Regions:
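Generic alpha-helical scaffold signal
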Residues: 13-16, 105
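Subset-of-secretome marker
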Residues: 2-6, 23-278
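C-terminal motif of bacterial Sec signal peptides marking the signal peptidase cleavage site
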Residues: 18-21
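Sec-dependent N-terminal signal peptides
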Residues: 4-14
């Protein structure tokens, strides 16, 4: 159980982290006439003005350590401070099912994860554990703050603006919203519109994985906001895919830190879990 919670917490953190970072045409006739590359660029530009959104995400990977599948829902506020609240509804790692319903909160540098009752002995009975994003970055040797700031619909859509084969497929209703469907591929050499740091991270990922391109399907509403994004990658060691459904753009929601008396320090739980895993 201890190991399963540790893996589940990591999966929930990865899900939330991976998701938190020119106006479009107003009628069907104009939208149909906009070239695919221009429409994708408009979507990236329009989404950059968004303050908050909700996303339901399903991610899956095959092959070795990457064999996993998870589904969750996250509400994210990008401005003025990064805030998010999410639930990991289900997760499977290397064929092992993990507890569902795990809740997590992100407030600036602070990440809170709900502790299953079975593990309350390691937290003094407290139901929440708190981690620092900046401290975790130092321990992992990775700038998680930078990754979080880039992990938003605008940056994700911007990746596909360099595609040389993007094309319009047709129209489709996504959760009651009429959208135009675009599809295409992008390679590490075609991400020139990203900043230097994002380009380097993108290229390094594909060098390590052995992948040479990403296949994407993007559904964009009349307001030039993405409503659905599906990405697929085939690499040397397996495959990966993700499906994201976006909604509730610029809608307000409440999120606050758990009461201080119900929170334990993440290092305490980390040490306890570590001793149980050896």
């Amino acid at each position: 159980m201890v190991r399963r919670y540790a893996v589940g917490t990591a999966a929930g953190a990865a899900l939330i982290v991976s998701l938190t970072a020119c106006q479009g045409s107003g009628d069907d006739k104009q939208s149909a006439q906009v070239p695919a590359a221009q429409a994708i660029a408009l979507a990236s530009q329009k989404t950059a003005t968004v303050d908050s959104y909700k996303v339901a995400v399903t991610a899956a990977g095959t092959g070795g350590e990457a064999a996993a599948k998870m589904h969750g829902t996250i509400q994210i506020r990008l401005k003025p401070q990064l805030q998010a609240v999410g639930t990991l509804d289900s997760a499977t790692v290397k064929g092992q099912s993990l507890p569902g319903g795990e809740r997590a909160i992100l407030l600036g540098d602070d990440f809170y994860a709900k502790v299953p009752q079975q593990l309350s002995q390691f937290t003094g009975g407290k139901p929440w554990v708190k981690f620092s994003i900046s401290q975790a970055s130092k321990q992992a040797g990775v700038n998680l703050d930078s990754i979080i700031k880039r992990a938003n619909p605008a940056e994700q859509t911007k990746i596909f603006t360099g595609s040389k084969d993007a094309r319009r497929v047709g129209t489709q209703s996504i959760d009651g919203v009429q959208t135009t469907h675009y599809t295409g591929t992008v390679t590490p050499e075609q991400v020139g519109r990203l900043d230097a740091g994002a380009q380097q991270a993108f290229k390094q990922f594909y060098q390590r994985s052995g992948a040479n391109k990403v296949t994407f399907d993007l559904w964009v509403g009349k307001d030039s906001l993405p409503r659905k994004l599906v990405t697929k990658v085939t690499a040397d060691k397996g495959t990966g895919s993700s499906t994201m459904i976006f909604s509730d753009y610029n809608k307000s929601f409440s999120v606050s830190a758990p009461p201080a008396g119900e929170v334990t320090d993440g290092n305490q739980l980390k040490n306890a879990l570590g001793s149980q895993m050896h």
